[in-house]
């Protein structure tokens, strides 16, 4: 969503006394070039959910709550909560994020990809932030995605019938992004 939408949403929830819960399960953990996607708009949520990137593929989820919410003993029960291996993995992920500057890399490489993708004729619209990018076409992308995977050996996601989603690893380099651009042009 646009920054304007996020600001209006935050204002509306505050005026109405409604808790703002943001799902950052896919868009969080550096994917958009900020640690959480909603940080681009400068708003603060009451609750933020996260998973996926939190433990680099090991099953784990978490949430952050505003200090306005006070924990109550016995309020939360969970079968798998506090898994030691998951917690150790999550700490290691944060250490690697900092050491390898993965959030900054996602921002930098994502900006490069967005700029280059917008130059390609035949793509109706390119949108996104960081390494969470969508390319919209005027036609169904099923055959294009098939050519990408079978002829160019490039895996992409889809959203609807006319949208290709790009969610590459946060370690993607500019050179690898350029290789993708070359292969995409060949498939087009």
Place the predicted regions along the sequence by residue.
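Conserved N-terminal phosphate-binding loop of PLP-dependent enzymes in the Aspartate aminotransferase
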Residues: 1-188
């Amino acid at each position: 969503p646009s920054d304007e939408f996020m600001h209006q949403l935050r204002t509306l929830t505050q005026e109405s006394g409604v808790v703002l819960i943001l799902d950052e399960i896919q868009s969080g953990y550096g994917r958009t070039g900020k640690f959480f996607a909603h940080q681009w708009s400068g708003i603060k949520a009451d609750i933020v959910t996260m998973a996926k990137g939190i433990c680099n593929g090991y099953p784990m989820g978490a949430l952050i709550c505003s200090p306005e919410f006070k924990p109550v003993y016995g309020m939360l029960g969970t079968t798998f909560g506090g898994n030691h291996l998951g917690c150790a993995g999550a700490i290691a992920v944060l250490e690697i994020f900092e050491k390898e500057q993965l959030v900054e890399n996602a921002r930098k490489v994502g900006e490069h990809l967005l700029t280059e993708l917008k130059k390609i004729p035949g793509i109706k619209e390119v949108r996104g932030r960081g390494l969470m990018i969508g390319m919209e076409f005027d036609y169904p992308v099923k055959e294009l995605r098939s050519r990408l995977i079978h002829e160019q050996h490039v895996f992409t996601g889809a959203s609807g019938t006319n949208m290709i989603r790009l969610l590459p690893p946060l370690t993607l380099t500019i050179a690898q992004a350029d290789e993708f651009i070359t292969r995409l042009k060949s498939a087009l």
